[in-house]
Every structure is written in structure tokens, then in C-alpha cells.
């Protein structure tokens, strides 16, 4: 039976509501309470070298800043990850994983830059990170483009490849179409993730369909506290 991992991305996706200004005590409180909840993966914010360091915000210019914000936390989940919107954080601002508080990095990108973004994912993997390739606007991909992307995924073998329903356009059948393409063609070592949005009030239905589908791969499903995130 394949494994299911829950990824909490409140401190990252929730930041679209408050420009990532949660306040340091709230940041660490959310982090430690999500650890207590049993979530296997916690995403702690964006890495974006266009933004200055601010201990009260979960958008950080480099990996060292993650340690400065979270380093005193007593508890930690099995995996801590950050997110990079491809093109917004240079490799020189990413420490080797062994020197970093992070275990993994998720990279979001649109299909027209899939080749450049997947090469960036390969460089992050060389630094020792578990890399998640996040397919923004999954509904923009044709089946042929999905197969092109899967070719890159199978070459690089990231930790996971994830469907991102950026505009909340999927319904369960539509989502499962993309999922089945991934499940049938991605190497067994690569996990498959799903990040839903609730524009048409279908996020919960889509997540249930994703979780209940018979599958060959381990999967990762995203969630936030109170559904906090980008509308």
C-alpha cells in the first residue's frame, strides 16, 4: 500500500493574505502546533532573494534566514520545506542541505519554462535537497505537454512532482485525468502531490478523489489551517 503524506503550507500559501507578516511568535506557534498535529511535512514560506530579511515574515531571501527564524524551535516534523517561484532565488543563496534547516525545496513553474525550471530542480537536488517539482496551472497542460514534462521528471527524479490547481478549475474527473497520466508514467521512486484551490468549492471533493484513487505511487496532499491561502 502506498503512503500518504500531509503537507501543511499555511506559512507559505497563507502569506498571500497578510504579505507573509504573521509575526515571529505566531510563526513559531503555528509551526510547533502543526508538528503536534502529526503533519509529515511543513512548508515554512517562500525563498525570494528580492525580499529583505524580516523575522516577522515567512518570505526570506536565503536559506540561512530560515535558521534565524525557526532555529530555536524545539519540535520539528519529519520534513521541513520551503518554496521557490522559479527565477526568484539564485542558487548562491541556497546553502547545501547539510548546512540548512530545510530538508526540501518546492519549485513552482509554468509550462513554458519547464526545461529551465527542471534544470534548476536538478541543481537543488545536487545540493542534497528533496526537490518537489510543482506544476503551476496544471489545467494549461495538454496530454502531450504532460508527457514532455514527465520525460524531464524521469530524467531528474525529484522527490515529488505535484499538480497545482492554481485557479481552482478542476473537478474530480478532470483532476484524475491528470493524476492517471502521472501515475502511469512517472518513475515509481517519484511521489505525486496535489495542491488544490477552492474557487468553485471543489477543493475538498478533489482531495477526496485524489486520496481514494487506487495508485502506484506514494502521494503528498497539501492543506492549510482554515483553508488560508491565495484566492
Segments from the language model and where they lie:
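Conserved, mostly hydrophobic/aromatic
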Residues: 14, 34, 105, 161, ...
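Glycine-rich, proline-tolerant flexible connector loops at the mouths of alpha/beta enzymes
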Residues: 40-68, 106-114, 163-172, 226-230
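Acidic (Asp/Glu)-rich catalytic clusters
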Residues: 35-36, 66-77, 92-102, 118-128, ...
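Alpha-helix-loop-beta-strand connector modules within alpha/beta enzyme cores
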Residues: 52-82, 121-134, 176-194
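Catalytic cores of alpha/beta
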Residues: 90-97, 141-153, 200-215
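N-terminal capping/small domains of soluble enzymes
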Residues: 1-86
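Active-site mouth loops of central-metabolism enzymes
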Residues: 9-28, 79-90, 106-111, 132-145, ...
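Catalytic alpha/beta core domains of metabolic enzymes, predominantly
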Residues: 160, 164-231
Amino acid at each position: 500500500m502506498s503512503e500518504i503524506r500531509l503537507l501543511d503550507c499555511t506559512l507559505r500559501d497563507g502569506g498571500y493574505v497578510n504579505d507573509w507578516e504573521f509575526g515571529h511568535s505566531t510563526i513559531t506557534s503555528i509551526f510547533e502546533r502543526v508538528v503536534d498535529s502529526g503533519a509529515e511535512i511543513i512548508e515554512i514560506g517562500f525563498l525570494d532573494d528580492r525580499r529583505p530579511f524580516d523575522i516577522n515574515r515567512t518570505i526570506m531571501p536565503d536559506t540561512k534566514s530560515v535558521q534565524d527564524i525557526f532555529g530555536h524551535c524545539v519540535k520539528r516534523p519529519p520534513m521541513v520545506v520551503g518554496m521557490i517561484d522559479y527565477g526568484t532565488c539564485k542558487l548562491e543563496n541556497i546553502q547545501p542541505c547539510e548546512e540548512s534547516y530545510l530538508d526540501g525545496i518546492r519549485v513552482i513553474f509554468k509550462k513554458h519554462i519547464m526545461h529551465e525550471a527542471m534544470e534548476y530542480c536538478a541543481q537543488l537536488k545536487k545540493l542534497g535537497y528533496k526537490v518537489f517539482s510543482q506544476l503551476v496551472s496544471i489545467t494549461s497542460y495538454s496530454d502531450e505537454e504532460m508527457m514532455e514534462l514527465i520525460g524531464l521528471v524521469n530524467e531528474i527524479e525529484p522527490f515529488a512532482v505535484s499538480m497545482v490547481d492554481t485557479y481552482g478549475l478542476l473537478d474530480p474527473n478532470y483532476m484524475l485525468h491528470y493524476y492517471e497520466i502521472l501515475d502511469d508514467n512517472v518513475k515509481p521512486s517519484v511521489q505525486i502531490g496535489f495542491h488544490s484551490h477552492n474557487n468553485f468549492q471543489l477543493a475538498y471533493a478533489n482531495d477526496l478523489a485524489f486520496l481514494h484513487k487506487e495508485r502506484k505511487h506514494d502521494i503528498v496532499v497539501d492543506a492549510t489551517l482554515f483553508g488560508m491561502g491565495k484566492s
